[in-house]
């Protein structure tokens, strides 16, 4: 749990007195629609970014210099992917219509921008994940008759999965936070509850947006933790030793 999440979580009970359930009941359909929009805009870019990043990360991890270090091209790739994440989200959201030719309020701007952020995070996580698998294991698998594809699919990916899934957790929670910024340019999400609540001085609207954003982050993070345990059962066995 991040420091910001901890602060917000501890503040929610203090602000509960400002929450009016009548407002929640009257606006239930709108809240559900914004929640689904938020979930879609957060999850789809993670899937797209990860799918694009993993082949790049694997290639970068396997490209080693003769002494075991990284080649200049690989270092440049990692630097550029890290640099992408330093671009402020609101600036990238505003830049997207110029690049894509879309409307400023199109959800596609948020989807593409967050796919870029997810890609940059997952390239770094993927390289670290594949680097964590010793080359000797891959070479042993090849010596036993595994094809390169079988060695990657049955050895490299399962052993790299814990680090990859940790990267997915970071990317997912980060996207849930950044989707809200899209409300500033008119893209509907739970962030719309923040902007509308502030503009119309409706504390209930703000509190619902905060609570649902936090809840979504906790639920998705928990699901990814569960997925990690399911896909890597040997780690639980190692911890019990």
Residue spans for each PLM region:
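Periplasmic/extracellular loop-to-transmembrane helix junction in inner-membrane transport proteins
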Residues: 3-45
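Loop-to-helix entry region at the N-terminal start of transmembrane alpha-helices
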Residues: 33-41, 93-121, 161, 205, ...
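Transmembrane alpha-helices
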Residues: 43, 148-181, 208
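Faces of alpha-helical transmembrane segments in polytopic inner-membrane proteins
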Residues: 52, 56, 81-89, 109-127, ...
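Cytoplasmic-entry segments and transmembrane alpha-helices of multi-pass inner-membrane transporters
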Residues: 56-96, 124-128
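C-terminal transmembrane helix and the adjacent membrane-cytosol boundary/short C-terminal tail
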Residues: 63-64, 127, 131, 143, ...
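Glycine-rich helix-loop "coupling/hinge" segments at transmembrane-helix boundaries
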Residues: 98-99, 178-212, 232, 236-241
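Short cytoplasmic-facing helical segments at TM-TM junctions of multi-pass membrane proteins
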Residues: 125-164, 190, 194
């Amino acid at each position: 749990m991040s420091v910001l999440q901890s602060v917000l979580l501890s503040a929610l009970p203090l602000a509960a007195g400002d929450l009016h359930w009548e407002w929640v009941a009257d606006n239930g359909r709108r809240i559900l629609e914004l929640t689904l929009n938020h979930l879609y805009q957060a999850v789809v870019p993670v899937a797209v970014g990860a799918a694009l990043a993993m082949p790049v990360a694997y290639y970068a991890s396997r490209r080693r210099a003769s002494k075991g270090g990284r080649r200049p091209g690989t270092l440049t790739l990692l630097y550029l992917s890290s640099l992408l994440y330093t671009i402020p989200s609101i600036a990238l959201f505003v830049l997207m219509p110029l690049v894509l030719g879309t409307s400023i309020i199109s959800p596609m701007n948020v989807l593409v921008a967050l796919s870029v952020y997810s890609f940059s995070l997952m390239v770094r996580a993927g390289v670290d994940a594949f680097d964590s698998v010793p080359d000797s294991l891959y070479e042993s698998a090849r010596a036993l008759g595994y094809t390169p594809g079988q060695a990657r699919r049955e050895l490299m990916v399962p052993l790299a999965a814990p680090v990859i899934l940790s990267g997915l957790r970071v990317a997912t929670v980060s996207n849930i936070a950044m989707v809200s910024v899209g409300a500033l340019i008119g893209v509907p999400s739970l962030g719309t509850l923040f902007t509308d609540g502030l503009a119309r001085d409706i504390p209930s609207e703000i509190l619902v947006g905060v609570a649902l954003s936090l809840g979504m982050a906790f639920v998705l993070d928990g699901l990814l933790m569960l997925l990690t345990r399911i896909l890597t059962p040997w780690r639980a066995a190692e911890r019990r030793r």
